[in-house]
């Protein structure tokens, strides 16, 4: 049996990345092995030089930071407050808060090694916001594509 365990990001400076993920994003340390650090929730960071050595060396396995091959996705129920905090930090934005076609508001920015981080508004918050703007549960379902029963359960509570 195969079991998924973690996503691993290669980083230049373990301490700088720990400060970012723990301090800004609130990640909780699971294991610190020096060259490899794992956080609760399935994210790990690995020191570039050590990782390249495991893979056969930098000539065989070059690392390209900022290549935009993917992103790490997080959610918050306080997107505006988190965005204001980001503006106080020394982060480079991919973009400020934008609304996706399905109604969710998100912000994207870079970690210290230019991995893309997305912080999205929790979908439950999207439903409540849209409902307060006059959308019916059916209209929210059409816009978001989420199951109607889920939307109705959120709006009832």
Model-inferred region functions:
Residues 1-10, 21:
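A broadly structural signal marking compact, well-ordered functional cores
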């Amino acid at each position: 049996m195969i079991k998924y365990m973690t996503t691993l990001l290669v980083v230049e400076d373990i301490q700088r990345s720990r400060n970012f993920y723990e301090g800004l994003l609130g990640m909780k340390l699971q294991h610190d092995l020096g060259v490899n650090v794992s956080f609760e929730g399935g994210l790990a960071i690995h020191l570039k030089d050590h990782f390249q050595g495991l893979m056969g060396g930098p000539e065989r396995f070059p690392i390209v930071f900022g290549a935009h091959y993917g992103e790490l996705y997080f959610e918050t129920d306080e997107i505006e407050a988190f965005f204001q905090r980001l503006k106080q930090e020394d982060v480079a934005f991919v973009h400020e808060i934008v609304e996706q076609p399905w109604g969710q508001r998100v912000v994207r920015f870079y970690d210290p090694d230019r991995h893309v981080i997305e912080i999205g508004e929790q979908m439950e918050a999207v439903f409540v916001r849209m409902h307060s703007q006059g959308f019916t549960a059916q209209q929210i379902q059409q816009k978001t594509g989420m199951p109607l029963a889920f939307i109705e359960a959120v709006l009832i509570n």
